[in-house]
Amino acid sequence: MSPAPMPVTTAEQDRDVVVIDAVVEEVRPPRLPKSHLEDLGPVSDMFPESWEYHPDLIMEFYRKRPLQVLGRLINILFPLLRFILGIWWEKLRGKDPTVSRAKAIQLRELLTNLGPTYIKVGQALSTRPDLVPPVFLDELTTLQDQLPSFPNEVAYRFIEEELGAPAEEIYAELSPEPIAAASLGQVYKGKLKTGEAVAVKVQRPDLVRRITLDIYIMRSLSLWARRSVKRLRSDLVAITDELASRVFEEMNYYQEAINGEKFAQLYGSLPEIYVPSIYWQYTGRRVLTMEWVEGIKLTNIKAIQAQGIDATHLVEVGVQCSLRQLLEHGFFHADPHPGNLLAMADGRLAYLDFGMMSTIQPYQRYGLIEAVVHLVNRDFDSLAKDYVKLDFLKPDTDLKPIIPALGQVFGNALGASVAELNFKSITDQMSAMMYEFPFRVPAYYALIIRSMVTLEGIAIGIDPNFKVLSKAYPYIAKRLLTDQSEELRTSLKELLFKEGSFRWNRLENLLRNAKNSPGFDFDYVLNEATEFLLSDRGQFIRDRLVAELVNSIDQLGRNTWQQVSHNIQERISFLGDLGNGNGKAHQTKTIKVVPQPAIAQQEETWQHLQNLWQILKETPGFDPLKFVPVLSQIIVNPTSRRMGQQVAEGLLQKAIARVIRQWALALESQPNPAIKIRNAA
């Protein structure tokens, strides 16, 4: 059905233009990759300016418009005061309002009625256990970003203004009504003149004015709270600015298109992932045209199974893709709800809607990997330090009372089913701890929680026994064993060595998990391990290996000597008894057993080596013959020869030290001649 634009008032559009001109600094979006420039011609000339969030300009703009602020403030404060009075009344009656499900529902409904900005606020609060009690967190996670649609004629008007031509000249078809309507815009299904099926997203009218006015009010209240409320642990102004920046990015459909292209470049080549294309000719600040993807929501399990698709496998694909987003490239989809993840007929997982994206800095990515490793190994002392590095705790925080609390919250995390103990339940359990201790949730982590909790919700619906942490750890183990970054090499060192002792069980655990990670390449790991061992970066491993070899060979030599000496003494004693005619009696003597603790340690080490060999044999791509060139490389390498020299020197030093010690003991045991003379006198 071809759309027919109707004449409408331009009051909403005029208000947007005034606000944009006065509030927002205009900047040109990043240029597209060269391939797109070649395909589309002078693309940079087609693009109008886009805009960014500037809080100072917003504050200055609305300070001069007190009547607008007052009108909106009244609309916000009356329902908000009713809610606060209800909380106060609950406290007067001796009830705890923070555990009231009715109050949580009331808050969700209040935020929905206040409009787009407060829907986004509620979604942001649903990932802030440092600010919101657990019952309220549960309810806010159900907050739906859905609003009634606005008239088609307004949408068609926006299309013409943004793209420079009436909708019927651009699209051969547009659905008679929107197929979805959210807080910031609505989506139509369409078809281009060239026949491609497309999704057309159009922004709501008067959106910028409403969003900026709400941001001004929230920011003003946050500034007042920062000045007046001394016990606030979180910076409400920074949280408001972070939220506003996200909303401004979502309102700019150019930015969403750029996000989609970047996501496709990073993850679109993965074999089971699909990312739709952007039609830049038909995209503007308030209109986005992208490829239409036919698929089934992951929550529609029966329909997926009817297509012969393994829904559980698709969730695993989503988990692995999310891990790459979070921990490999640091650019991730922060809103993977069921409507944005589709099962395609060919079994691939399609990602949609790139308005809410976020980035993680390298030190944060490495910190998260370290935290997961410490969590899995129940190393809560190190986990507490990770929270300091990840900005959850200030550097001067006393960690002693926090460590046992972490153990209580995370103690059984890895072994539990996702339905019993998952990211959301961990978040719920941490909420009480965050009220008790001075935790603060960084903005980047709030979006990670939102992303992973949403993905886990889908997993639970498909398979209640799906273990997200167990599925995630093989990837973590692979990264820890193969990543060449200095941060993860240090983490590997701390994980495998403690007080000079090698922790074989942790290496076994890493290899056992890493071999189950998709894309694990045994040849690559073997070559990387050899290269690392012989490089300058592997010095600490070589030092530990030399120490282990020296100790093991020394203990073996000492035990062998003790055993030989004991046997000789037994033989001499036996022969002496025979000469005295007491051989029979000697046979009845109990042979003294020399304590040999080092032998038990050697047997334990040998058992660990056997376990490692068994794990390697079970690894895809394993072949014992692959060790031959590696061993040859190690033998002829000068570094290996130096290790041999260090082992020999270490053994010699131990032998000399032992001789000196025995000589000193012998001197101490001999009587002093001077004392004998005095005693005789």
Swiss-Prot record:
Taxonomically, which superkingdom? Bacteria
Care to name a GO molecular-function term for this sequence? protein kinase activity
The protein's matches in InterPro entries, at most eight in alphabetical order, are given as: ABC1_dom, Kinase-like_dom_sf, Prot_kinase_dom, UbiB_kinase
Q: What Gene3D superfamilies does the annotation carry?
A: Transferase(Phosphotransferase) domain 1
Q: Which residues form a coiled coil?
A: none
Q: What Pfam families has UniProt attached to this entry?
A: ABC1 (PF03109)
What family classification does the UniProt entry report for this protein? Belongs to the protein kinase superfamily. ADCK protein kinase family.
| Protein name (database record) | Uncharacterized protein sll0005
Q: Which species is this record about?
A: Synechocystis sp. (strain ATCC 27184 / PCC 6803 / Kazusa)
Q: What is the lineage of its organism?
A: Bacteria, Bacillati, Cyanobacteriota, Cyanophyceae, Synechococcales
